[in-house]
């Protein structure tokens, strides 16, 4: 097991040190869709970096950073998910209204996931729940006994209404 960690660590270190170091002009041929640039005007050695193109929108999130970013994002994804769920849980603890949840950018399926963990009677994901409802695998009055499902259904209706009215909020959670 330790050997596996050593190999993965070495691979990450190798990718981190060589990411973007190799000269793009020597390794890759210019495609017909690439913007022709003289070698003097290239501000970096990285291949297909968005700052080198005239369509640069200034957003660093749209920049291609290579293997290191992919590995970092894969490692940080569970932490971001936990942070979002904690934010939603804090809103629920403060008895936030539907409008406050919507203003915070909470999507209905994320609200259901957070409520589901607080309510012991809900032991399945939203997609499993909806599938069972449509297949009539348990009585319909069972659904309405769950506070989690009632809260989710109320917020989902509010969310859909706001989306239909064109009052869109950037989804942050």
UniProtKB/Swiss-Prot annotation:
Signal sequence, start to end: 1-24
GO annotation, cellular component aspect: extracellular region; host cell cytoplasm; host cell nucleus
Intracellular or extracellular location(s): Secreted; Host nucleus; Host cytoplasm
Compositional bias of kind Basic and acidic residues: 37-49
Up-regulation conditions: Expression is induced during host plant infection.
Location of the motif RxLR-dEER: 46-65
Assigned keywords, A-Z: Host cytoplasm, Host nucleus, Secreted, Signal, Virulence
Start and end residues of each stretch annotated as Disordered: 25-64
Domain notes: The RxLR-dEER motif acts to carry the protein into the host cell cytoplasm through binding to cell surface phosphatidylinositol-3-phosphate.
Family: Belongs to the RxLR effector family.
Job description of the protein: Effector that leads to host programmed cell death.
The protein's name: RxLR effector protein PITG_10232
Species name: Phytophthora infestans (strain T30-4) (Potato late blight agent)
């Amino acid at each position: 097991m330790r050997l596996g960690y050593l190999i993965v660590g070495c691979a990450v270190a190798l990718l981190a040190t060589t990411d973007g170091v190799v000269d793009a002009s020597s390794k890759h041929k210019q495609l017909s869709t690439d913007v022709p640039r003289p070698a003097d005007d290239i501000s970096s050695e990285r291949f297909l970096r968005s700052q080198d193109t005239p369509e640069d929108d200034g957003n660093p999130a749209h920049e291609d950073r290579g293997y290191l970013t992919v590995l970092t994002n894969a490692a940080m994804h569970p932490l971001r998910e936990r942070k979002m769920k904690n934010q939603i849980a804090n809103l629920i603890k403060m008895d936030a209204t539907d409008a406050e949840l919507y203003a915070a950018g909470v999507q209905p399926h994320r609200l259901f996931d957070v409520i589901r963990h607080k309510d012991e009677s809900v032991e399945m994901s939203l997609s499993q729940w909806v599938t069972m409802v449509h297949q009539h695998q348990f009585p319909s009055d069972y659904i309405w006994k769950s506070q989690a499902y009632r809260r989710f259904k109320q917020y989902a209706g509010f969310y859909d209404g706001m989306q239909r009215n064109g009052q869109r909020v950037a989804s942050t959670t």
